[in-house]
Structure formats: C-alpha cells, structure tokens
C-alpha cells in the first residue's frame, strides 16, 4: 500500500488486543521505515481512553518529527505591526472536527484573532498541509484551543522555546486571550490557562460572590463538553452577560 499511495509518513496506531499482547509497534515502525523509506512512527493508543489522548499523541508526534527549525528569513508580518520587529505569527493547536465541527468554524477563530492584529501561521490540524505545519517554529506564540493541542504545545516549547497559552477565541474573551498572547510573546510570566485566570478575576458578575446562597443556587447555566472550549465559552458569557457559569 505504501508503494502505491506514497504517503508523506506512516503512523501506526494500536488497539486493545495488540496492546494487551505487548506488540512492539516502535520496532515495527522502524522496520517499516527501513523497508519503505517513508518516515514511520508509532502512536501508542490502546482504545481505552477518549479521543483527547489519541488525537493529542498524534499531534505530538507530528511536532516531534516534522516541525523544522525556525526560519531566519524576515517575517513579513513584522512590517505591518505598530511595534517594530514584533512577531504576530500564531499557531492554533487542537483544531479538530470533533471539537469544532466544519472548517468554517475554524476559519471564524482565525478571523477573530486577526481582528486583534494576529496572523495565523498554521492550524493543527484542519485546513493546513503538512508543509505548513512544518513551519510552526516560525510562530511567536501557540494557542491551545482544545485539550488535544496541549501535548504538541509542550513539544514546541521544549524544542523551539515557543510559549503557549490555553484558550479559544470566543466572543469578548478573545480580547483577554489576545492580551495573554502578547504577554507570552514579551516574556511576561502569566497563567497559561487564560480562560481559568479570566474567570477567577471576572469583575462583572452580578454580586455572585456576595450572595449567601449555596454555590449550586448561584450558577445560572451549566456547560458540558471539552474543557478548553467550554471554559473559554464560559469566560465569554461571564464577561459579556455577567451570568455565572459552571463547566
């Protein structure tokens, strides 16, 4: 199949039975790469966890194997920023159909950040090619928009020193996220999990902390779903509508 399709890489993912049998997928990957000449690696899934773990390990492997060192070429985006030499390139990590649905939703996130002067370098991994993902080291900051992207963010930080923040651009929360991205680029020490810090410091809640009612009675709505996207949505709701939200 590899000789016919000629893929850019081969990823070997496990399932419960091979996992319990102790199948040596890294060794199989090594032999496969030697035989085909195609980059091959194992993704140690076992069918016993949710999609966040498996998809996260897949993006982690892409970051480990295919992202090239930062280019020394002048970044065109720097010419368009108010502050000379400031890099406004950003990677969005964890953009999957399971969390964001159609590609149009991902494009909406891009436009939201572009309104604050950011330029999207790559989206992991909807709508971009492997070639574009390989240029991720050129970005000034990574934004983890879902839990799936966290592993890749840590790899890119370790290999290239790229800082990351956690949060999805939703409503009025996008401004807070942009501020955290700017702080990360400038080297300021801020809380990585932006939506959590934003919610804890929200000043627009209608006397939520002053009420004598129990916490269960204070909550006006509950969001159920992936932690980063739901946490970001909760922060946006609290900021815009002053309504307490539980995730």
In which residue ranges do the predicted regions lie?
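An N-terminal assembly and electron-transfer interface module characteristic of large anaerobic redox
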Residues: 1-247
